[in-house]
């Protein structure tokens, strides 16, 4: 809330009208997202719009279609608690037990801060998208940078989600049809399942135009994610001796040299900055204050879930920990197969949210190349453009996922490059460009430190991941 006070003087009347439309009850409606129960009691402060005004009626109807605070939380939590959560034991393996704890606390604070910075930057710049804000302060080069960053993050995420579908759903179906003896039927093979599930479930969901339409699916996805975490926590210690890890070095208890690889994996799990503007503008009666509260709750819950999954998984598997912790369990374990089914369902609903972002990025890039006319943050793709772009993105990402299964390395590279740029470098840098004249050197220092932190993760983690990939030390992740 202190950030709001700092920037309030910079906001003009038009921006407050656009971004904090609500804070008064509309006639005939109840704002179930109000900050307290006293809203509406002071009639002197209530502005009653003219219901005969067509424009006012249109605004009211459009506002009613948007997500409540609860549904916005589900969308944000689902964006955070996505594929990255099952790689958390791998993150602890790379960071060490103490290093992992410090990583969760530090990244939790930083991600929470930069998420709120994005919305504050939107308000200050009077824009509706993350890329629009960056373009406002950095010009066309800035817009292209954030478009490529957002696009590559979402693109890599979509590939990862398809990989996870191949890691989870086949195990469940093979257990149901008793196909775990090595002779796997054609229809139960990994790549066949990826193609079938993506084509007939993820693809239709990806055709949705509005992110609000995914709110109910996001609610079910968040519930399924909680089931997954609890299943790993409870079932892991009950595994037979041969499936568990038994080797712990002294460095595993403290902080390891590969901690930057861990920061990349955790960053991928927590970063959802490319979705932020969409979720903010999908909120009913939106305001920066409400988004601040939403962000605090979502980040706290997400960090707790990630840490619980990370430490419980690493405690069981230790040196045997894989990039996807579910692949460390037997394929015939009934409880884990239920968790795999839940996780596969979670990917089916998270995948369309990434496609939503990716489609917007492609639309903007095509517009910059003059291949699409009149496309900006206030317009939508035509029906034909929507179908062609969505179909291309879904099946290209699906096709790439058929060629690899090293989830840990994929998320490390995405986290080290695009997530660092999108979450740790651009939000504070954009804010500095918008407000630097009104800040003292001490006030600017945290922004500079965050930017340096982002570059450190990008350079060190990427280098370590590429070296390991070249040496082939992560090949065991593909043995499922």
Swiss-Prot record:
Topology within the bilayer: Multi-pass membrane protein
Cellular compartment(s): Vacuole membrane
Transmembrane region(s): 72-92, 95-115, 145-165, 214-234, 263-283, 297-317, 338-358, 394-414, 447-467
Keywords: Amino-acid transport, Membrane, Transmembrane, Transmembrane helix, Transport, Vacuole
Compositionally biased region (Polar residues): 37-46
GO cellular component: endoplasmic reticulum; membrane; vacuolar membrane
Endoplasmic reticulum listed as a keyword: no
Family: Belongs to the amino acid/polyamine transporter 2 family.
Job of this protein: Probable amino acid transporter of unknown specificity.
Family matches, as PANTHER family: AMINO ACID TRANSPORTER (PTHR22950), SODIUM-COUPLED NEUTRAL AMINO ACID TRANSPORTER 11-RELATED (PTHR22950:SF458)
Name this polypeptide is given: Vacuolar amino acid transporter 2
Gene that produces this protein: AVT2
């Amino acid at each position: 809330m202190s950030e709001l006070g700092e920037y309030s003087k910079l906001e003009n009347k038009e921006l407050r009208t656009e971004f904090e439309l609500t804070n008064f009850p509309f006639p005939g409606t109840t704002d179930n997202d109000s900050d307290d129960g006293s809203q509406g009691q002071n009639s002197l402060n209530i502005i009653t719009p003219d219901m005969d005004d067509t424009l006012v009626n249109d605004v009211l109807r459009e506002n009613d279609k948007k997500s409540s605070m609860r549904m916005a939380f589900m969308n944000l939590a689902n964006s955070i608690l996505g594929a990255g959560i099952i790689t958390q034991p791998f993150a602890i393996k790379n960071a060490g037990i103490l290093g992992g704890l410090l990583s969760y606390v530090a990244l939790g604070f930083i991600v929470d801060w930069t998420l709120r910075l994005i919305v504050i930057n939107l308000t200050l710049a009077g824009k509706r998208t993350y890329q629009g804000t960056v373009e406002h302060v950095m010009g066309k080069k800035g817009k292209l940078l954030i478009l490529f960053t957002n696009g590559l993050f979402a693109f890599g995420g979509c590939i990862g989600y398809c990989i996870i579908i191949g890691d989870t759903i086949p195990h469940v179906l093979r257990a149901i049809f008793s196909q775990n003896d090595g002779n796997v039927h054609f229809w139960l093979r990994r790549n066949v399942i990826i193609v079938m599930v993506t084509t007939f479930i993820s693809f239709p969901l990806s055709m949705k135009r509005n992110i609000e339409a995914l709110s109910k699916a996001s609610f079910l996805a968040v519930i399924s994610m909680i089931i997954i975490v609890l299943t790993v926590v409870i079932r892991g210690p009950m595994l037979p001796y041969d499936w568990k890890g038994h080797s712990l070095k002294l460095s595993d208890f403290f902080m390891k040299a590969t901690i930057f690889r861990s920061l990349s994996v955790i960053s991928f799990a927590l970063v959802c900055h490319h979705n932020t503007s969409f979720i903010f503008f999908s909120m009913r009666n939106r305001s920066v204050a409400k988004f601040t509260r939403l962000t605090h709750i979502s980040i706290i819950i997400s960090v707790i879930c990630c840490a619980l999954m990370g430490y419980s998984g690493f405690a069981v598997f230790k040196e045997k920990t894989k990039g996807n912790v579910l692949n460390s369990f037997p394929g015939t374990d009934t409880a884990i197969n239920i968790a795999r089914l839940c996780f596969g369902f979670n990917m089916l609903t998270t995948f369309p949210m990434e496609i939503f972002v990716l489609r917007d990025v492609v639309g903007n890039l095509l517009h910059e190349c003059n291949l699409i006319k009149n496309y900006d943050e206030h317009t939508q793709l035509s029906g034909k453009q929507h179908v062609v772009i969505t179909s291309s993105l879904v099946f290209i990402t699906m096709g790439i996922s058929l060629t690899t299964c090293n989830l840990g390395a994929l998320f490390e590279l995405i986290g080290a490059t695009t997530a660092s740029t999108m979450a740790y470098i651009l939000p504070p840098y954009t804010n500095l460009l918008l407000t630097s004249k009104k800040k003292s050197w001490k006030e600017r220092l945290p922004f500079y430190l965050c930017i340096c932190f982002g570059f450190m993760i990008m350079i060190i983690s990427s280098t370590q991941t590429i070296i390991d990939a070249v040496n082939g030390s992560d090949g065991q992740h593909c043995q499922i």
